[in-house]
């Protein structure tokens, strides 16, 4: 059986906003199975944003586990991520999951990797999935050279990735949080 492939998820922090967006394409081998999948969600009463890349069923398993950790740790994003990773590394079933999560709240943006790592990216920019390198390059250029807001940067970088990556489409889901904190621009 072939694996489901690809997606692109981008998260940007700028000003008092954090935004996560993703495309809607699900691909099996060389066939597009679905074009309007929703890979970005709000969790914990809308206070946490999360997006996934990788095998869809695996990602839903991780979403459920992560959401239960968020509840258990009263919305503490970092603690919930670390506890999820502990489970991931010790549970035989979880160790086989092929997915990445990009998560963010008003304080932090994190990547939970397929190896069971928690990574805080430089400059509040996350890009994962098959189109991630294209979207990251575009988002970084926009952060460094424009005054665009976080939502516009996420949208434009996803569209650029969709123009280049065959596993990414232009059917976008974008969620944003107002953080009340001011994030510096890349310099």
From Swiss-Prot:
<feature type="binding site">
    <location>
        <position position="162"/>
    </location>
    <ligand>
        <name>Na(+)</name>
    </ligand>
</feature>
<keyword id="KW-0021">Allosteric enzyme</keyword>
<feature type="binding site">
    <location>
        <position position="168"/>
    </location>
    <ligand>
        <name>Na(+)</name>
    </ligand>
</feature>
<feature type="binding site">
    <location>
        <position position="165"/>
    </location>
    <ligand>
        <name>Na(+)</name>
    </ligand>
</feature>
<comment type="subunit">
    <text>A double ring-shaped homohexamer of HslV is capped on each side by a ring-shaped HslU homohexamer. The assembly of the HslU/HslV complex is dependent on binding of ATP.</text>
</comment>
<dbReference type="Pfam" id="PF00227">
    <property type="entry name" value="Proteasome"/>
</dbReference>
<dbReference type="InterPro" id="IPR001353">
    <property type="entry name" value="Proteasome_sua/b"/>
</dbReference>
<dbReference type="InterPro" id="IPR029055">
    <property type="entry name" value="Ntn_hydrolases_N"/>
</dbReference>
<dbReference type="GO" id="GO:0005839">
    <property type="term" value="C:proteasome core complex"/>
</dbReference>
<dbReference type="GO" id="GO:0046872">
    <property type="term" value="F:metal ion binding"/>
</dbReference>
<dbReference type="InterPro" id="IPR022281">
    <property type="entry name" value="ATP-dep_Prtase_HsIV_su"/>
</dbReference>
<feature type="active site">
    <location>
        <position position="7"/>
    </location>
</feature>
<dbReference type="InterPro" id="IPR023333">
    <property type="entry name" value="Proteasome_suB-type"/>
</dbReference>
<keyword id="KW-0915">Sodium</keyword>
<keyword id="KW-0963">Cytoplasm</keyword>
<comment type="similarity">
    <text>Belongs to the peptidase T1B family. HslV subfamily.</text>
</comment>
<comment type="function">
    <text>Protease subunit of a proteasome-like degradation complex believed to be a general protein degrading machinery.</text>
</comment>
<keyword id="KW-0479">Metal-binding</keyword>
<protein>
    <recommendedName>
        <fullName>ATP-dependent protease subunit HslV</fullName>
        <ecNumber>3.4.25.2</ecNumber>
    </recommendedName>
</protein>
<keyword id="KW-0378">Hydrolase</keyword>
<dbReference type="GO" id="GO:0009376">
    <property type="term" value="C:HslUV protease complex"/>
</dbReference>
<keyword id="KW-0645">Protease</keyword>
<dbReference type="GO" id="GO:0004298">
    <property type="term" value="F:threonine-type endopeptidase activity"/>
</dbReference>
<dbReference type="GO" id="GO:0051603">
    <property type="term" value="P:proteolysis involved in protein catabolic process"/>
</dbReference>
<keyword id="KW-0888">Threonine protease</keyword>
